[in-house]
Amino acid sequence: MNYSSISGTYDRRYEINPLKGVEHALRGLVSDTSARRLLEVGCGTGHWLKTLAPDVERVVGLDSSIGMLRRVLDLGDRIELVCGSADSLPFALSSFDLIFVVNALHHFDDKRGFIERAEHLLRPGGGLAVIGLDVPPAIGLSVIYEYFPGALEFDRSRFPGWEQVGSWMAAAGLAVQPLRTVEHIRYEKHGRAILDDHFIQRHGGSVFMGLTDSQYQAGIDRINLAIAAAEARGQEAVFKSELQLKMAVGRHT
């Protein structure tokens, strides 16, 4: 997927929701693994690199999109950027204390192979963390899945199940930790305010990259119909989403 096309607006998501639960979980892993050298694979615009850099000696970010990497500002002397693929991981063996992926594993072509390669890069006692969306949502609803045809099917095709992720970690020789929910995302929009919501804009998320223009427009049309139907009753349509981000962790023994 061409993330360079949305790099200019990508960080808007963190202004809306800074994902403090994810930050807390990552800081906890840094502490638990006594990590000094970190690698984020699929680092995008470097949000988590900049968040964790003050706590460690070195943070390396790898991403395949040069457009996203060019958005990383104020690197400082603790952050290193590498334009490359999760399919190769061009780093020395046993060179990191913590490797983490936030909302990116579903983009990797060889997900199991990535986990195997990551295990080789970990120092003894180090950890691999995969954080991502629970698809389909275990609780509540998703406006995107409810209104946009093909969105749920597309995400199901690219997000591996959490049991699968855990089995890949175990097969790679990692000691699998209990799966944790690290973030609850809840929001509610009333009436026409939903049409201005960042996350339903055409470039608001990668899920829409998997939809045709006609599928995307069909979703917008459905939302408009729901708004109009509520207004005809003298009411205001209510759009709710409640999602979870989970974290799978494997420790190098």
What spans do the regions from the language model cover?
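A conserved beta-strand element that flanks and buttresses the S-adenosyl-L-methionine
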Residues: 100
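Conserved Class I S-adenosyl-L-methionine
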Residues: 45, 176-253
